[in-house]
Amino acid sequence: MADARSIRQQNQRSWDAVVPAHASHHRDVPTFVRAGGSSLFPEERALLGDVQGCSLIHLMCNTGLDTLSLANHGAVVTGVDISTAAITQARQWASDSGIQATFIQADIYDYLAETRDTYDRVYASYGTICWLNDLHAWANGIARILAPNGRFVLVEFHPTSNMFDAQWQLARAYPMGGRQLDIEGVGDYVAASGGGLSPTGFAAGVHDFVNPEPCHLFQWGVGEVVTALASAGLRITRLDEYLFCNGERPFADMVELPGRRMVAPPHVPDIPLLYGVAATKE
């Protein structure tokens, strides 16, 4: 069995392969953010609070559209991601838009252990937890880089949604325990969202992308995430669950509401599809 670092390096290769496909579906990001546009949803904005003048780091920031949006809300932003392709794209969008942002390519565990910087806000969102092989090292790293009275915010896909197959039938056990899940590769979920993840305007871009690089996920329950943060000395101030998805369409028959909000079709009972956590360092 591969060691954790080798797994993360393989995941980096999978992300590097898919980033050009994802980026191809966004129309003119620099113009969008230069005009003050924001890709953020109300849920993360509410949990983050007023970020005007705050130093903020966006962990596992991908290509940085949300990071640049946070700058438009007044934060002094840094984004960190393991993918070289993602950080290259983020830096290009920042340069072309004139938005001030720092983007760092690094393994998240290395960054959290080695940086000397601290931040008023630490933010992670939408598909980050599944790439973490060690929740406690992650949470301890967050506590380390938070400034006193700083706030950590997570908005994430609810693991309950992974229990269902494409027809909304219960098919799998609740994801937890850090079980490793090996899949063919990071897919083109931006294309599959049909514009839900392209607030700048959807472009057809790359068609029928197939990732040649497999990847490896880790399955964690909500309780495990919250416990890791609390064990790191953070005080949990909010734990919210939401009966909708923002942007992404994990089931093909989801109904899109205004604001790029995706809900289950009428015949499906409500289940939590997202959750949000806010925690402070005291």
Language model features with spans:
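Conserved class I S-adenosyl-L-methionine
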Residues: 151-203
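Conserved alpha-helix/loop element of class I SAM-dependent methyltransferases that forms part
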Residues: 27-54
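Core SAM-dependent methyltransferase catalytic element
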Residues: 232-234, 256-258, 262-282
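Short alpha-helix
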Residues: 216-239
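N-terminal, positively charged/glycine-rich alpha-helical extensions of SAM-dependent methyltransferases
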Residues: 1-29
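A short glycine-rich, Lys/Arg-flanked "PGG" loop and its adjoining helix->strand segment in the class I
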Residues: 136-151
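A short acidic, Gly/Pro-enriched loop at the edge of an enzyme's catalytic core
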Residues: 113-122
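Class I SAM-dependent methyltransferase SAM/SAH-binding core
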Residues: 54-111
